A protein has these predicted regions:
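C-terminal motif of bacterial Sec signal peptides marking the signal peptidase cleavage site
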Residues: 18-22
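Extracellular mucin-like PTS domains
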Residues: 29-91
Length: 331
């Protein structure tokens, strides 16, 4: 019995030793677990890289990119129609011009004036032609008592016109007083005449007479004449265009129905040499001062500062002169 007890005691001791050994292995295992914790720490250090990736997400966010590119490529059909600006400019009111002369409706000069007005881009001229049926040079401001007859015709180039049986002033009177036209012209152009109408001769000029007939009816008027000899109408038309370009606003600023102070008389030389030297504002002359009225003009003449329309014309300038509405008193 005693031996058995000893054996049992020995067995218990062995079990205790085994348990102790087991505890020791657990501690060793626990000691070797430290590297595992280190590995876990290494994994934890990779988290910031994930965080960096997460930070980059806003720069590539799909909600940001469309918002940036939409204004550049997006069409505007969604805008309300009411806010769409107009794509057309309202048409410009035409400038209404009555054209007349004293050489008759079939003369080259009046047709050249008509064609030059129609060639303007801006403003748009609405041209109406009413002129004597026949040549009426030298008739001044003469007019017929009572109504006059008129006939539909065409100018040299085929433009519609009305031919009046009477004086140059009758043509204007028929248009404005007899109801020949149904509007009030913005201004009247008389000419261009075949031959100059300088100061000493304005009162016998039918070209000036027709312009005066318009002016006394409170309508601005221009009388334009081309110098004798070669009748350089092209040069005259250039002068007329230049004059209108610089003075159209003044002509159109005239208030309908208010008095007109003067007629503008323009005389353009036909140059035998050189070219017209430009437009110059001068008063009417009272005599020819020795100039040959029917001679060609040397437009290379160097003289400057002409005193009147006679000097200006014969030294190569286009003379622009305000002309009284009434003829100068005789005697």
């Amino acid at each position: 019995m005693k031996l058995a007890t000893t054996s049992r005691t020995t067995a218990v001791a062995l079990v205790a030793l085994a348990a102790l050994a087991a505890c020791s292995s657990v501690e060793i295992t626990s000691t070797t677990a430290a590297p595992v914790q280190t590995a876990t720490t290494v994994q934890a250090t990779t988290v910031p890289s994930v965080t960096v990736a997460a930070t980059a997400v806003p720069t590539t966010s799909p909600t940001t990119t469309p918002a940036t590119t939409a204004p550049a490529t997006g069409p505007a059909p969604t805008a309300p129609p009411a806010t769409t600006p107009p794509t057309t400019v309202p048409p410009e009111e035409p400038v209404r011009v009555l054209v007349t002369n004293d050489d008759g409706y079939s003369a080259e000069g009046i047709d050249m004036v008509v064609q030059s007005l129609l060639a303007f881009d801006r403003p748009v001229f609405e041209v109406t032609v009413v002129a004597p049926l026949t040549q009426q040079s030298g008739q001044g401001g003469n007019f017929t008592d009572g109504p006059v007859n008129a006939t539909s015709v065409t100018t040299l180039s085929g433009y519609p016109a009305t031919a009046v049986e009477g004086f140059p002033a009758d043509a204007v009177r028929w248009a404005l007083d007899q109801g020949g036209i149904d509007f009030i012209p913005d201004f009247v152009i008389s000419g261009t005449n075949e031959g100059q109408n300088l100061g000493p001769f304005v009162d016998v000029s039918g070209t000036v007479g027709a312009a005066r007939a318009a002016a006394v009816r409170n309508i601005p008027a221009i009388a334009i004449s081309t110098g004798f000899a070669s009748f350089d109408y092209e040069a005259t038309i250039d002068v007329l265009r230049d004059y209108l370009a610089g003075n159209l606003d003044t002509l159109l600023a005239h208030e309908a129905g208010t008095p007109v102070a003067t007629v503008i008389s323009i005389n353009v030389p036909s140059c035998s040499a050189g070219e017209v030297r430009g437009l110059v504002d001068v008063p009417l002359g009272t005599d020819l001062q020795g100039f040959d009225y029917g001679a060609d003009v040397d437009c290379t003449n160097p003289a400057e500062s002409p005193a009147d329309d006679v000097q200006a014309f014969f030294t190569g300038f286009a003379a622009v002169s305000p002309t009284p509405l009434e003829p100068a008193p005789v005697g």
